[in-house]
């Protein structure tokens, strides 16, 4: 179940995800605001690529710049999703994103665990990680469909060990001290 009751988006007229056809598995997820996704090519990626390809020794600032250029952009959705403990929300790319817009999800899929919703340090807003490999910046308008969400039940192994720790934060917090 998705909701748009995030405090920072109150009164902004966000649309809850919905399926487009009777047999659709995925709920279309929209951008919560206008955002421009820069092209990796316009962010000095070509220079760094040539240095690597030609066997040049890179210095630390080159590595830092490459990491910054290839860092995904987080597109806010303004929604959060409540699920039972044995469900997960999978975020998948829309086929039109890669085919028509040169937009990819660099993590392949997004995994939204049930305990991401309203944990102590994170209200649970869902973001979609994207990377624009097209040659131009891509403008995404509020309300444009940017991903699809699929709710899936999952199983645990017979020898799964009980876990006492709870999630305390958001992105990248699983398994870190003070995170989960």
PLM segments and residue spans:
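DUTPase catalytic domain/fold
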Residues: 4-180
């Amino acid at each position: 179940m998705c909701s748009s009751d995030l405090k920072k988006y109150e009164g902004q007229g966000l649309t809850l995800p919905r399926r487009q056809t009777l047999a659709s598995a995925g709920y279309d997820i929209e951008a919560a605001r206008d955002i421009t996704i820069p092209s990796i090519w316009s962010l000095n990626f070509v220079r760094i690529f040539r240095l690597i390809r030609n066997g040049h020794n890179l210095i630390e600032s080159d590595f830092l710049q490459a990491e910054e250029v290839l860092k995904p952009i987080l597109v806010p959705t303004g929604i959060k999703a409540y699920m039972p403990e044995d469900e997960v929300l999978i975020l998948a790319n829309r086929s039109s994103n890669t085919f028509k817009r040169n937009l990819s999800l660099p993590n392949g899929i997004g995994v939204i665990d049930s305990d991401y919703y309203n944990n102590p340090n994170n209200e649970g807003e869902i973001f979609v990680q994207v990377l624009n490999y097209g040659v131009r910046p891509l403008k995404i308008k509020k309300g444009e469909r940017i991903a699809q969400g699929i709710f899936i039940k999952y199983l645990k192994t017979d020898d799964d060990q009980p876990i006492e720790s709870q999630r305390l934060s958001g992105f990248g917090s699983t398994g870190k001290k003070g995170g989960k």
